[in-house]
């Protein structure tokens, strides 16, 4: 059995921890763990900053970042608007009025992934909008909400977030919360 000095053991533990964190530093889970544990009780009003280039959203209270999230913004042809906005509506159980499915009276999906403006409604069916939970509308028809994250811009212009992050941003924001969307 090899006996090490206590100082050497601590040094080795520190090296292993450092190497592990360096290997994970690009993982969003590390960033999520670090920022999700920051107190949300910092005084000051919340604000939201979205970086389309980084595909990240940040929640601030004053100058303190209290949360961050991976996102999926608008794909080609459905770009997310850039500029300074503010939350104009909150809807915890929002559904899209444009995108969704045509469903028959028994609840069976007749036609999926439709644009209600362009796709003809099959007989004996009705439109059911795609769920967009924790919707924070910042410009007419555009908002942050829970949705699928394929790792690239893929939405119709909204900003999709994981469930737990969309909920965190939703609970922190209020009508009038500033939203800055940067290229």
Which role does the model predict for each range below?
Residues 4-15:
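Bacterial N-terminal signal peptides that target proteins for export
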Residues 33-63:
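Post-signal peptide N-terminal segment of mature Sec-exported envelope proteins
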Residues 21-24:
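Bacterial Sec-type N-terminal signal peptides, specifically the leucine/valine-rich hydrophobic h-region
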Residues 53-55, 62-65, 74-76, 90-93, ...:
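Solvent-exposed coil/turn segments that connect beta secondary-structure elements
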Residues 65-76, 101-107:
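Short Gly/aromatic-enriched secondary-structure transition segments
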Residues 82, 101-183:
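Exported/periplasmic cell-wall-interacting domains
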């Amino acid at each position: 059995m090899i006996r090490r000095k206590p100082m050497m053991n601590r040094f080795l533990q520190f090296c292993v921890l450092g190497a592990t964190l360096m290997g994970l530093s690009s993982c969003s889970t590390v960033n999520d763990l670090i920022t999700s544990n920051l107190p949300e009780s910092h005084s000051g009003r919340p604000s939201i900053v979205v970086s389309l280039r980084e595909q990240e959203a940040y929640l601030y209270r004053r100058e303190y970042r209290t949360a961050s999230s991976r996102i999926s913004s608008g794909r080609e042809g459905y770009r997310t608007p850039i500029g300074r906005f503010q939350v104009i509506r909150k809807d915890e159980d929002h559904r899209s009025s444009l995108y969704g499915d045509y469903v028959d009276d028994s609840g069976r999906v007749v036609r999926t992934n439709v644009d209600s403006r362009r796709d003809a409604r099959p007989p004996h069916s009705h439109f059911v909008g795609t769920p967009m939970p924790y919707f924070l509308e910042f410009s007419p028809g555009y908002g942050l909400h829970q949705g699928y994250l394929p790792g690239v811009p893929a939405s119709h212009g909204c900003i999709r977030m994981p469930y737990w992050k969309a909920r965190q941003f939703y609970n922190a924001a209020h009508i009038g919360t500033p939203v800055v969307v940067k290229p």
